[in-house]
Amino acid sequence: RTFLRNISLLTLGGIASQKVMASNPTRSIPATDAISSATAGKKMGLQTYSLGQELLQDMPNGLNRLAKAGYTDLEIFGYREDTGKFGDYNPKNTTFIASKDYKKMVDDAGLRISSSHLTPSLREYTKENMPKFDEFWKKATDIHAELGVSCMVQPSLPRIENEDDAKVVSEIFNRAGEITKKAGILWGYHNHSNEFKRVLKAGEKPEQNPNPWAPPKGTYIEELFLKNTDPDKVMFELDVYWAVMGQQDPVEWMENYPNRFKLLHIKDRWIIGDSGMMNFPNIFKKAYEIGILGYYVELEGDKKGRTQFEGVEKSAAYLQAAPFVK
């Protein structure tokens, strides 16, 4: 085991991690201005999942409030494949917005929709179902092109039991990326913590009494995705908080795969910078070194009696004041 060199966790003396294997991709997705350059000052993105119903209840005023806080870009969520509209994952939600209406409200607020999180409802990632996944991404791409997005990102992990499963999923990802690329849109995958679990080859069994000093068997799911997807078709959005929760150093992953991580999710336990556990100076430094296209703030977790809008605004203030954020 090797200890993290550029530690991105500040509590408990850091987390030990098995060093991920470096890749050497010969190709990469061409650079796209994912985060808007139309606004002077810092360019800050927000994943609208952070607000949920608080935004949907009054979109025009809510969007203006985000612009006033300093956000320039949105990464939206809530795409409905049955209607092609956008809403909320909350089953009680009754507000759904057509793409053209969504874009107009965002444009009127001086913001831009530059990315979107969406996932097919089909859960069986098999070779037989590949045409069905293709159809999902073709329809979704047409609708997202109306929004003018630069990126479409899948944020949910299919069921993966072994390396063969990961290879099939990677091929489905490659096909999705090929579809969106024809529309000038980057396709990406967003991690949580489960991607940093190790899986074995099909039929291989874990050791009953492993040597505690030997390297652990198996390969990280995230690493299998990186190795088995085409850099010309698939990029990755690194959620730095969930990487840390998976006992990983996000800086180390960016070092080892500098041409694959194009977007970041900047996240903390709730408000950005409040917990003191995330080493954001190191994270941003490495992100700029590898040339990320942009980042999106996302809030989850304990509200501590405050509204989500308050958390989003306080997070923006932290990033606006941070000297390490460009």
Task: Please tell me what each predicted stretch does.
Residues 1-24:
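N-terminal export signals
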Residues 7-9, 13, 105-107, 122-235, ...:
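Active-site acidic/histidine proton-transfer and metal-coordination neighborhood
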Residues 19-57, 64-65:
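C-terminal segment of N-terminal export signals and the immediately downstream linker at the start
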Residues 34-39, 63-68, 92-114, 136-148, ...:
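Acidic (Asp/Glu)-rich catalytic clusters
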Residues 42-47, 74-76, 113-118, 152-154, ...:
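Hydrophobic faces of well-ordered beta-strands that scaffold small-molecule active sites
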Residues 49-51, 77-79, 118-121, 157-159, ...:
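Active-site beta-loop-alpha junctions enriched in small/polar residues
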Residues 52-55, 63, 93, 232, ...:
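Gly/Pro-rich active-site loop or hairpin
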Residues 76-101:
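Glycine-rich, proline-tolerant flexible connector loops at the mouths of alpha/beta enzymes
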